[in-house]
Every structure is written in C-alpha cells, then in structure tokens.
Amino acid sequence: MSRRRQATRRPVQKDAKFNNTLVSRLVNTVMVSGKKSTAQRIVYGAFNRIAEKNPAANPLDILQRAVDNAKPRLEVKARRVGGATYQVPVEVTTDRQFALALRWLVDFADARKGTPMRDALATEIMEAYQGQGNAISKRDEVHKMAQANKAFAHFRW
C-alpha cells in the first residue's frame, strides 16, 4: 500500500428517486452483500410507511431531523499513556456523525425481530425524529461516556 498521499474521498451519488445524498447514504448503509436494489426497496418502503403515518410531513424532512437528533457530537477514543489506557473524549467530524447516526438507525431497526425491515426502519426513524428510541439512547450513552471521561481531555492528539 502506497504511503505517498491520502486517497481522495469520492462524492456520494444522489439518489435516483429523491435526488438526495442522505437517502443514498442510507441505502448504502442498509445494503448487505452488494444487493442495492433490495436495500432501495427497503428504504423506499420505509418512506412509504412514514408518509402513511404522517401524511402532512415530507419523509425526507423527517429523515433529516431524525439523523440530526441521533448524531453524536462527542465520542471517546482509547489512548495509551504510560502503560494505562484512557478513554479520551474527542469531537466527532461531521462525516462520521452522519455515518454513526445512519448506522445506529439501521442496526437498531435490524435488531427488531419479528417485523419486516422496512417497518422496523420506519419506526426507528420516526422514534429518532421524536427524540426517543434506541438510536437516541445510544447517542446519549456515548455522550455520557465522554462526559464521564472529561478529565482526560488533555490527552487529545
């Protein structure tokens, strides 16, 4: 692997149906084993469920608010200093905030057994939109860990 320079990030293509990069990133997060059409069917089905539950609201706006609510601002990273490992709180970059929020939404939707994935994803997005649900509790847990380890913030690198 070459060490000359860092690889450039390729921009995410906009979604064909909604013309939105956030939807495209959600589809890519849902995708398993390269089955993109299945992932698109799941995400579009979830949007249909959201539209059925809230006919007045736009599903894209609901998704945007849900992701904004689930985004972590701080997280902890392990840092080894003098034989001891400290959990050092660090700020999360914008790109990683989106990635973590989407991953948490999809993972917790996948963990809801007994319901189709599109319904579980729609429920998880709606709960995050309302400021509750598993993704929000995960964000709060990460923030709580960062707050508890605030004393080690000077080990930041």
Enumerate the language-model features and the residues they cover:
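Strongly charged
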Residues: S2-S33, S37, G45-W157
